[in-house]
A protein has these predicted regions:
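Short alpha-helical
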Residues: 12, 72-75, 106
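Phosphate-bearing ligand-interacting subdomains
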Residues: 39-96, 100
């Protein structure tokens, strides 16, 4: 039986996560946020308080969903997930009902697959990675943990993306390309050759 879910964060990505979970029929208990805003509800779901409220919950009773957005040069999303896992909370993966995910695709914990995404056969997606709106990933790709493929990204077959990579909106990655870890790809890029680790690639 599915546990109720508490969403971390209260920004735009948290709204999308909440909307997706509602479409999937999940019970969302509320949001936790450290932002000092005046909001009391988002999508008619209560803001429960800051993350200290989680001390009142057990990992036996609730699961978490990471609603903290992923942007380049900001590890907040991944740091918070690590801290909550150290308290034994679990982050289930979820797939938007309009996404297509081939039956043999491997998803690690905490993967978020958003509306209209396509993930083809032979592909694996690492822990806590966001496959955002209308992303297309073709056959036999490997996407590492803590990645964000922003809306409209296209990966041809055999692409390998290492951990911690941010691929900007509308980028296109040609077949069999490898992107090294902790690299940021600017929106609208087209990649024809491998990209090294720990760099920022501006639009070419």
């Amino acid at each position: 039986m599915d546990k109720p879910i508490i969403i971390l964060g209260s920004g735009g990505h948290a709204k999308v996560v909440a909307d997706t979970l509602k479409l999937l029929g999940k019970q969302v208990l509320g949001f936790v946020t450290n932002n000092n805003d005046s909001l009391k509800k988002i999508l008619d779901i209560n803001i429960l308080g800051d993350d200290s409220i989680l001390d009142k919950y057990s990992n036996i009773d609730v699961d978490l969903a990471n609603g903290i957005g992923s942007i380049p040069y900001d590890a907040t999303r991944w740091d918070v997930a690590k801290r909550m896992r150290n308290k034994d909370f679990r982050f289930p993966s979820f797939i938007h009902p309009t996404a297509f995910v081939s039956s043999d695709v491997s998803l690690d914990e905490g993967v978020q697959i958003m509306a209209g995404a396509t993930i083809q056969t032979g592909t694996s997606i690492g822990m806590d990675t966001i496959i955002n709106t209308a992303v297309a990933i073709d056959h036999d790709c490997s996407i590492g943990k803590n990645c964000h493929l922003a809306p409209g990204t296209v990966c041809s077959g055999g692409v390998s993306i290492k951990r911690g990579v941010h691929v900007g909106t509308g980028s296109v990655i040609i077949q069999n390309i490898t992107i090294g870890k902790d690299t940021n790809i600017a929106a609208g890029s087209t990649l024809y050759k491998d990209v090294k680790s720990n760099i920022t690639l501006f639009k070419n």
